[in-house]
Amino acid sequence: MRRTARIMLVLLGIGLILFIALSGLFEDYLWYSDLGYSQLFWTPLISKGIIQIINGTILFTFIAGTLFSIRHAILTFVNERLRKRLRLVHEMDRPLYHLSQRKMTLWLIIISVLISFGVSFVTGFTGWLEVLTFLNATPFGQGDPIFFKDLGFYVFQLPFFITIYNAFFGPLFFLTFFTIVFYSFAGVIHFQSLLIWKKQAIEINSAARRHLALLITVLFLFKGFGCYFDTFRLLYSQHGLVLGAGYADLHATLPALKALLVLCALGVIGGGLAFFKDEVRLLTLPILAIFISIPLLSGLGPMVLQSLVVIPNELEKETPYIQNEIALTRFAYGLDQISEEDYQADQPLTSETLQKELPTLNNVRLNDPHPLLRTYTQKQGIRPYYKFYNIDMDRYWINGEYRQVMLAPREFSYQDLEKTAQTFVNLRFKYTHGFGVVASFANAVTPEGLPAFAIKDVPPTTDYQELQISQPRIYFGEMTHDWVVVNTDLKEFDYPEGKANAETRYEGKSGIKLTPFNRLMLSIKHGTLRFYLANEINSQSRILLHRNIMDRVEKLAPFLQYDDNPYLVVDEGRLKWIIDAYTVSKTFPYSSMYPERELNYIRNSVKVVVDAYDGTVDFFAVDAQDPILQTYRKIFPGVFKDLSAMPDTLQTHLRYPETLFKIQSTMLKNFHMTDPTVFYNKEDTWDIAKELFGSEPQNIAPYYSVMRLPDSEQPESVLMIPFTPSSNANNIRTNMVAWLAARMDGEHYGELILYKVPKNTEVDGPLQVESRIDQDPEISRQLALWDQKGSSVIRGDLVVLPLAGNFLYVEPIYLQSEKAGSIPEMKRVIVAYGDKIVMSETFEEALAQLFGVRLKLSPPPPANVSALAVSPMSAELKPEETEETTEETEEPVDPQEDTQALLKQIEQIREMLNQLEQQFKKITGDSVDVEGGKKADEDAHDVQTDPEGSVSSEQSKTNP
């Protein structure tokens, strides 16, 4: 009975462990199925299971075979010794015969199963993707320059073969070594001499010899397998000058690998003969030969050739291989698709050219993202638990104008709740989502130096139809790290509203239903009984898991790499995240490695869209020609939709990804040089242009801009970055030599253009402009005056703006009090052109000082939503709220009468300004060119409606 009870307890424990493990799998299955991607759950799971079974079976064969062979060899050895000592004649007289019976066999099988499937369980999860890509490989249609194999062989097949080799060679080597050591200690192998090439050096019985012969034969077979594929791995070589196979690799290492392959073949033959013939040297001599040959052939030989032949004539010997590295690296990073154009950079900017470039000037980014984030937090945080994670740049057509917009979602920060409010009910049932977004125009600043909001407040309000939000709730974002339960008996907190709080219920379709069985499995998975004890949970309740959008997509498709900067867009009233996903490889031949991400091939093949409200995820194939994506589409049919399935309204918001652009810019520093001689001599290496951050120089980050490219008629959204020559401590060069632009609108999406400054033209780089700003006596005096105790000066990012064959440099200056909770205010704008630098209160004034012309830059677009129109959110107001609103607006207001009265006042002010201007001219004898015409002040004082909803006149100042 006791034995039966123990067995039952053991079985119960095993069952409990399996049940706990399966609870996690069950939760994953429910989650994948809820999103409609069950094949992303089943395909990897089944693949891993099959691989583990195959891997475990093969390892079991090796281990069990070895253990049984060791047992047989030792028993044979001991029985022979005992028979001699006891003088037993009959062959059936075996003193240790009983040891070979059932109990030992059972224990050997148990040990073999535990070791083999234990190792398989640990390693079997890692190789599933290599197996599936091997079975579904897509050719690149281009061969490598050495072995002429399709490039897909190196991306798909070779990693699979290397995985197989690594999975079995190590365990085989260990088993062989363990067997030799065990036989030696057991006395089965007796070394008569260390000179193992002699005939009588080793004494071994026949059973042990046959066992070792079999192990060594298989080991040589695998080593030969490895040597063969090592020849192709030479195209990843990092020895010598070239990344990839160089002269020494192909003329020394490759022959050495072929020689080792021959030795392995001889080892296989020798092992086979030793199995039948009592000659130990058939085993020892091949082992000795290969141990001596590996360091001599693979190490010393290439080193000698490199030193004596290659280095004295390095350029001559390595030129064809340098060309291979340049060509394939450029292909791997998409640099071969960059079109190059000359950018003269010496064309004078006139009033006519500036007038033509108004669309570009109207979108100059004056609001710097870093101070803007603080401003959003202080002005639009509303409550301490609302946080803005970062600022997203995008563009919208607003009232017929193409405008750059800076936008940040208002997410819920659980750690900023009062400690006493961080209860289970609040964290899981009550506070479930963020609310709305804040947006402002990139170039619009109020007279107080604050951003002009395009979307603001809670609930979100806007004057623009294109930015109307009908569903502002953010259940899935960048700061939503924990699960929540929705549709409980407890209403969810929606947003703060007066003395009370607005409440809501989740109406999305996603979420796992909390059925009794699901609650049981989730309780086991999360180690809590609250799924049963909480009275708020009912039959309609759902649990929302993996709400962080990056965790969400990485769990769905871990075989893709993702951009670090997802961005939110307003799409037909809903908030949607767009995440750039990459297909990558680190086994692309002859391609230089990008170390920060361990890759040497990358394509932005996929755009992922996540709905911020219900968490639905869609994968769209934007580069359907990419062979890696084509392979994934074979493995996971139906997961990746065609780009044509993406709504047109979303396609207009697709951006060229910043991470990919950084990678390409980094690689372009060297690989813009396509001539092997120039590349070898490093004659024209570049650096990313630098700017000052505090007092230290740092690389300029790529930035989005709406501008008109050279030879283009219309403004468009581009991502750009400037380059300067490479510098060192002895030779510091910071002039600009080129700038790279990525187009992203319409049919031009993804086009890369490299604009090169002629070598005989000297153009200031950003760091030079920063130095000139510091050296300007008036500017430096004013900044030093402000940057005293009680306040601090914040210098925004320096924006380099290519403009009509020249460059304009713009840097906003912010002033912030040192008091807690203070808001950075933009007080000045520094603009540089040629050898001139000015600092003014506004961008318009700075341009007027530089060029003597006052341009009529567009303010924020006029409102196109009636102030009396019902917003989408107002339909959700409670009856009492509606009554209050009605009472407040009982008295009718005629906007036209108000506007006419204001226009009369503006006209009076205009007359006063004209009189002052005439007096000024009489005193100075100077003339002011106002757009070259008579109606400068009229243009400068056009009436506009600002984002705050009030009517104001644009303040403009005359250039003294």
Curated annotation (Swiss-Prot):
Top-rank taxon: Bacteria
Signal peptide coordinates: none
Biased composition (Polar residues): 950-960
GO cellular component, one term: extracellular region
Membrane topology classification: Multi-pass membrane protein
Pfam families, per the entry: UPF0182
Subcellular location: Cell membrane
Biased composition (Acidic residues): 881-897
Basic and acidic residues compositional bias, start-end: 931-944
UniProt keyword list: Cell membrane, Membrane, Transmembrane, Transmembrane helix
Chain spans, region Disordered: 866-899, 924-960
Transmembrane segments annotated in the record for this chain: 7-27, 50-70, 105-125, 169-189, 212-232, 256-276, 285-305
UniProt-listed HAMAP family: UPF0182
Homology family: Belongs to the UPF0182 family.
Protein name (database record): UPF0182 protein DSY1630
Organism of this sequence: Desulfitobacterium hafniense (strain Y51)
